[in-house]
Amino acid sequence: IRQPGLERAIEFELEHLNEMGDPCRKILILELMGKHSNIIFCDEDRNILDSIKHVSSHMSSVREVLPGRKYFLPQTQEKSDPLTISEEEFIEKVCKKPCSISKALYTSLTGLSPLISEEICYRASIDGSDAALSLNETACIHLYHTFKRLIDQVKEGDFTPNIIYRCLL
């Protein structure tokens, strides 16, 4: 089991015997991306054998997810690594984007989802729907330190999962 970088994808490498009795490998990939989530089954060369959702070129200009095609993760080369980003790079990448603060976070940093981006804004007492360009330097530095505290919690395993139950009577 492995996770490529901080991507929202998990790969399971499976070994089995083929019809001739020879050992073979297959890869089962779970992409955890909200409404775009998918489960993709590949051979050892990462050729797609099948997937839960087939994605054609008409549905996505980024990549096709179809049997016979090569599997690859969508490119994230313009995104920064949240584990190593400096304060200066954070200000440049996040606070100078022409979109909402929340969107600036998840489109600038690998592995962040819209939900965790909203949580970072909430913890910083900032409205995530405000424009990133509207943040002054002090607010942007505060957002960075709030983000950094959350990342440090994740690195150290300092969190407690919870189940929230709400009765609608």
Task: Report the location of each language-model feature.
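Phosphate/anion-contacting hairpin/loop surfaces
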Residues: R2-L169
